[in-house]
Design a protein with these regions (language model features):
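Glycine-rich beta-to-alpha active-site loop
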Residues: 167-184
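Conserved CoA-thioester-binding segment of acyl-CoA-metabolizing enzymes
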Residues: 73-136, 148, 157, 164, ...
Length: 184
């Protein structure tokens, strides 16, 4: 059903997950759960569900969306986008879009933010960068859960790498040749 919502253009995969986590208070959204279980296994479950959705004329009343079929066929996890970029009239708005975690910075967000900043800095038609955060917070800071998980798993090198990469991204924002504004 989550895949059908995305397939019908109701909202994005990230929005479906966010809605489940915020609205239903799930620990993980449906697409995150599919990644955890495995997209292939999730697809097999969806096929079983589809077989239960038979009308009187033996035709299915629900079908698995093509993009879910292709994802399962490739046997790859879903990729989530937590940084959105829009460019209008030379102004690039980069929105950190992880409001369910107060836009806290984790590895994925920092990497995606770095890619977005690099792209708009290289874009000659952009003269201004506006940084924004979706939801109630601009950015809550680093995701503390990341640090706790890495300390518990004795992965201190991951913390050092994350911190180093975070500094590089923040320095690229600070040293941008573009006018840079943060909306808080």
């Amino acid at each position: 059903v989550a895949a059908q919502i995305v397939d019908e253009g109701v909202c994005s995969m990230e929005d479906v997950d966010r809605g489940a986590k915020v609205g239903l208070r799930w620990a993980r959204g449906p697409f995150e759960l599919m990644n955890k279980v495995g997209v292939q296994e999730s697809f097999e479950m969806a096929k079983e569900y589809q077989s239960l959705c038979q009308n009187v004329d033996e035709k299915s009343s629900w079908s698995i969306p093509d993009f879910f079929f292709k994802q399962a066929e490739n046997d790859t996890s879903w990729d989530f986008s937590y940084v959105d970029t829009q460019i209008n009239d030379g102004i690039a708005t980069i929105t950190i879009n992880r409001p369910e975690a107060m836009n806290a910075l984790n590895e994925t967000v920092v990497n995606q933010l770095g890619i977005a900043v690099k792209a708009v800095n290289a874009n000659e038609s952009v003269h201004t960068i506006v940084l924004d955060g979706a939801g109630k917070a601009f950015v809550a800071g680093a995701d503390v859960k990341f640090f706790v998980d890495k300390i518990r798993s004795d992965s201190i090198d991951d913390i050092v790498e994350f911190t180093s990469n975070g500094h590089k991204v923040l320095n690229s924002i600070e040293n941008s040749p573009k006018i840079t504004i943060a909306l808080t």
